[in-house]
A protein has these predicted regions:
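N-terminal targeting/trafficking signals and adjacent low-complexity tails
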Residues: 13-21, 133-134, 148-149, 172
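C-terminal edge-of-domain segments
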Residues: 64, 159-172
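Short, low-complexity, polybasic intrinsically disordered segments
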Residues: 129-160
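Basic, amphipathic N-terminal segments that precede the first structured/catalytic domain
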Residues: 6-50
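Short glycine-rich, basic-tinged beta-strand/loop micro-motifs
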Residues: 119-130
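Acidic helix/loop or adjacent segment enriched in Glu/Asp that either coordinates divalent metal
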Residues: 87-116
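Acidic, metal-ligating active-site segments
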Residues: 52-53, 57-80
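A short acidic (Asp/Glu
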Residues: 61-65, 132-139, 166-167
Length: 172
């Protein structure tokens, strides 16, 4: 099944609800909030890198997805914006991994011009294991091809902390 098929029911990017890690809602459209964050941090002298990742957790008949935009300040910690959504769609493990990647790419694509304009490095992180003994590895080639084919830097486990640590914390 093509990955684009997974996004048919995707929420419109402009209607997505985002929040900060402390739970405060982000009232602005996400592109405006990201631009404001970039401006604020660069005005404060920080060089930023952004990592975008998604993780999911099956909870009964629902699957919860969390997508994060992680802002790293070189040598000075970071912060993130979070979006959650739930679906009752049933996925195989491979399909779920590819839906996670598609959700991350959707956000990365919408924001990449901002990152280019402000000279911010960006990576897309996939919660996919590079070890073939893990089931998620079945999606590695497709995920890597999708992310690299879109022109984005790609990270998988164990380097994919945005998805495997940050987004994982949100869904667990």
């Amino acid at each position: 099944m093509p990955v684009s098929a997974f996004l048919v029911n995707s929420t419109n990017l402009f209607n997505m609800l985002w929040r900060k890690f402390n739970g405060d809602p982000i009232e602005l459209p996400i592109a405006h909030a990201v631009e404001n964050a970039i401006r604020r941090e660069t005005e404060n002298g920080f060089h930023l890198k952004v990592c975008i990742g998604t993780d999911s957790q099956v909870k009964g008949i629902e699957t919860e997805f969390a997508t994060v935009i992680v802002f790293l300040r070189e040598g000075h910690g970071g912060f993130m914006f979070i979006h959650n959504e739930k679906t009752r769609t049933q996925y195989s493990i491979k399909e779920r991994m590819l839906v996670e990647v598609a959700k991350s790419i959707e956000i990365a694509y919408e924001l990449c011009n901002l990152f280019t304009r402000y000279n911010v490095d960006m990576e897309v992180h996939a919660d996919i294991n590079t070890n073939p003994h893990f089931k998620s590895n079945d999606a590695l080639k497709e995920a890597m091809g999708y992310i690299l084919g879109m022109g984005f830097a790609f990270k998988a486990k164990p380097e994919a902390f945005a998805s495997s640590s940050c987004a994982n914390k949100v869904v667990n």
